[in-house]
Amino acid sequence: MSERPALALLAAFLLASCAPSAPVASGTTQRNAWTEPGHLRIGSSEEPDSLNPMYANDQAAGDVANLLYEPLFRYDQNGEFVPAAATVVPTLANGGISRDGKTITFHFRHGMRWSDGAPYDGRDFVFTWHAVMNPHNSVRLQIGWDDVRAMQLRDPYTVVVRLKAINAGILGDLAGIGGSGYPPIPAHLLATLPSLDRAPFNAAPISSGPFVLTKWNHGASLEFAPNPYYWRGAPGLQQISYRIIPNSETLLSEIRTHEIDVYDSVSENQIGELKTLSGVTISKHLSANWRRLQFNCAKPQLSDPRVRLAIAEGVDWDWMLRTIFHGYDERAASDVVPTSWAAPPIKPWPYDPDAAKRLLDAAGWTVGADGMRAKNGMPLAFSVSTTPAKQANVQAEVQMQQQLRTLGIALEIKNYPTNLLFAHDGPIYTGRYDSEFTIETNGPDPDNEGAWSERFIPPVGANTSWLRDPIITQTSHAALLTYDRAKRRALYWREEARIHQLVPAVFFYWQNQYAAVNSDLRGWRPATYFSDLWNAWEWRI
């Protein structure tokens, strides 16, 4: 056989292999040929850094927590509380919150069990509070939990929480999942341990949620099966494979070849191609995820707000959003979700390199013969760090580097894998970084005290900007001391105006979350807050 006919036959074979498979009949309906009934395959660019939510930092850990744990309340797709392990959401109106706002009563469902058959009830909730506050446990955050004066176990199904002061955002901290909200962990397994930092549970937990972990193939996948004791009954899936695929191009390839059924948080440059795929549905929603260039304000070259504002005005953020990020997201001006009742009337800093140069001149940073700025012998140079899994992140860093150089600022790119960047002993939480170009996520309540107050600088909190400002510290705290939304809104507007003035971060965009899912998947209802896996027990395929 000559070479040309052989190549022609090979080409015909490859074309046939790559062609979309025809739907397969299943009873009275049709399903895609690649669908594995009852088995959902999720692709993730990250691997959980811990399966104990108290120690977890990344989005993958938040996803998996929604499979493994049943919090007192879940957030629905609109950010509203939905009773889960608790039977009702406490309010002033229903008496669950006392008139003085300092006592909250939680009622647990009867008959709930952990996946090992042990009872799951208020005792686990009380133990969880003690675990969060245990000084031997290096938990991620204590925000909200440290406002509790005492917890009283009235009976196994009733817990009375007494607060040191009113905290309007505390329900999300104590009873939600995500942010500083930790679901209860099992007292019967963990209460005798002096510290949970190295507990085997952190990598091999039992479950109170709809699924149990059957195997963790580190670096490859986490496998889940239904929890036989889940209080809602058997979930609709028989198996979930949560596959670790760090590269966005590989994720695209695997949804294209139908080796995965869900590709969440799609990279912006891939959305157009994904919309052309047969048997794949694209969902879109505004998420509570926001990208920022956050500064370490404790660094001497970044301690002056004029320098930080010059960086904000010296980079064409709108151009980057339109081009590098393909215009799929919404420009940000603050860290309050645009749809929130507390969203402030603030506009982003404009692109104005001439104004940026004037600010740097006024701050005493002079231009040398090489065109770069220095002050008292110290060069105006800093580094930026991101997670390089998404190509657009690195492209944006390069663009910042080029534009800041025209102002006389040297920017070094120093990137890390997610698990290193956000580790407790990693660069961000130890302050060994200059700036971070990363995604942060919000809860439904606009409380952001833990992000900006000097009371919550690590290791006691998550103010990783190291910003110290009495107005922000006082105002963010005062906003938690009332349940009156009008008063809270006024306080948050004042706080956000101050943040805008001091520029501890350049707020870049609010993420429109895109997901590519197998069109056979039923029950997929992506959420604004925390995780799209919030209702996994409802899924069918």
Functional labels for PLM-detected ranges:
Residues Q142-A191:
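Surface-exposed binding/hinge segments that line
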Residues R41, D121-T128, P156-R162, I166, ...:
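Alpha-helical secondary-structure segments
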Residues L15-S17:
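C-terminal motif of bacterial Sec signal peptides marking the signal peptidase cleavage site
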Residues D76-E80, I177-P235, Q239, E249, ...:
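Gly/Pro-rich hinge or "lid" segments in bacterial periplasmic/extracellular proteins
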Residues A22, N217-S221, P226, R291, ...:
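Detector for C-terminal structural segments
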Residues A199-N202, N227-E273, A396-Q402, I409-N419:
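Ligand-site clamp/hinge motif
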Residues G43-I97, H130, A204-S208:
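N-terminal lobe/hinge region of extracytoplasmic solute-binding protein
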Residues V89-S138, V160, E254, Q301-S303:
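Aromatic- and charge-enriched surface segment that lines or borders ligand/interaction sites
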